[in-house]
From Swiss-Prot:
Cell compartment(s), UniProt: Cell membrane
GO molecular function: electron transfer activity; heme binding; metal ion binding
Periplasmic side, ranges: 30-175
Reported function: May be involved in electron transfer from bc1 complex to aa3.
Entry GO CC: plasma membrane
Electron transport as UniProt keyword: yes
PANTHER family xref list: CYTOCHROME C (PTHR11961)
Recorded superkingdom: Bacteria
Key words of the record: Cell membrane, Electron transport, Heme, Iron, Membrane, Metal-binding, Signal-anchor, Transmembrane, Transmembrane helix, Transport
Name of the protein described by the UniProt record: Cytochrome c homolog
Organism: Rickettsia conorii (strain ATCC VR-613 / Malish 7)
Amino acid sequence: MSGKELNKIVAAILFASLIAMMVGFVANILYKPTLELQHRGYSVAVQESSENQNTTALEQAPVNIPELMKTANADNGREIAKKCLMCHSLDKDGPNKLGPHLWDVTGRPKASIADYKYSPALSKLGGVWDDDSLFAFLHKPSSYAPGTKMSFAGISKPQDIADVILFLKTYVHDK
């Protein structure tokens, strides 16, 4: 095959492509397709879940923590706190995992475990872990300490938070 024949073949392919493109443009001009967006399938109306309603109610209404603590259930708190054990240990002087151990956390100064590197957000808070601070932190860690390393979204139901706090107070000390 000579160079002239190869040039003819390439020119024919390019010319055919150009003709096909031009035919497409002309057809679009003549027929002016309507580009009305049509919805495919069906849409589902989503109602706000009760969990979201509880979260917004907790953020809007003041919560009486001492009253919740009177009705708290440590056994329910134990079940809810199983989520915590993925990142925390409950053993006395237990190993730090992704988070520090939670032995005797109630009443302990914040960011006080020496061999754990806390985020700057939590390190500069100061104070001790009392019912109020634990409640706020467990409800929404990112709101209580913006910039915290803790990626847990929080516990939405106030009674569940009180149950976990009671569990942390009683179960750990009895071990």
